[in-house]
UniProtKB/Swiss-Prot annotation:
Naturally occurring in which organism (per UniProt): Drosophila melanogaster (Fruit fly)
A cellular-component GO term for this protein: recombination nodule
Name used for this protein in its record: RING finger protein vilya
Pfam families per the UniProt record, alphabetical: zf-RING_5
Subcellular location: Chromosome
């Protein structure tokens, strides 16, 4: 769409919408580029046509047509172009009774319609790709949400297990300390009892053995042979 001097957008005339670059399909009515009509009756914008100088300085420039691959002359599309060239872009070609003008415009219409059909197919494909991408994104988003919930549960479970392991370790440490303290206490008490019992036993045993030896020796020394005394059976005769 063209813009007026006041900055307001102005809708282009429908009769000019078919004028386009035969290579990139840029519209003439957008007024963004300079357009040329070549002698081979192809229309191009300044970006899609190669221009070279003529044979002499006063000679017209030579254009390289990218459609028919020929070096031809050309004219810039302006209101000041010759009338027989300007008639090719007449808004009502059916009124001038020129079959070539109608054929020229009809060919450009078909070319631009094919371009629009290609763009519509591309747009349809893009819309389908967008829908597929949206469904895939929604699926991935739901999966990501489920994974976040699962991750949260696993983190809570991990914290619980870590706390449980720490409590078990602390309990085992306390039990080991209590066992060591009990074993040390029992060892000290048993050693004290053994030391207390061992000393009197040694002395008493030696005293008993010495007294036994003395008694046996005294018994041996005191044995004396004497009469055998029969039992006294007293009775009356």
């Amino acid at each position: 769409m063209a813009k007026s001097q006041a900055g307001q957008t102005v809708e282009p005339e429908a009769s000019k919408l078919w004028i386009h670059c035969n290579s990139c399909c840029a519209l003439f009515c957008d007024k963004k580029h300079t357009f040329f009509l070549l002698a081979c009756h192809h229309v191009f914008c300044e970006r899609c046509v190669k221009v070279s100088a003529g044979r002499t300085p006063s000679d017209a420039p030579i254009f390289e047509c990218s459609t028919c691959r020929r070096s031809v002359r050309g004219r810039q599309l302006t209101n000041s172009m010759p009338n027989h060239f300007k008639q090719l872009f007449h808004p009502e070609p059916f009124t001038i009774g020129n079959d070539f003008v109608e054929t020229f415009q009809r060919g450009n219409h078909r070319h631009f319609d094919k371009y629009k059909e290609r763009k519509e197919l591309e747009m349809d494909k893009l819309f389908k790709d967008i829908e597929v991408a949206k469904s895939v994104c929604q699926k991935r988003f739901l999966e990501a949400q489920m994974l976040r919930v699962e991750r949260k549960k696993l983190m809570q479970r991990s914290r619980y297990i870590k706390a449980e392991v720490a409590n078990r370790k602390a309990e085992m440490h306390r039990m080991a300390q209590a066992y060591r303290s009990r074993s040390l206490t029992s060892q000290s008490s048993s050693s004290a009892q053994r030391s207390a019992r061992g000393r009197p036993r040694g002395r008493g045993t030696a005293t008993q053995s010495s007294s036994r030896r003395r008694s046996t020796e005294s018994a041996k020394r005191q044995q004396i042979t004497s009469f055998i005394h029969p039992p006294n059976n007293s009775f009356d005769l």
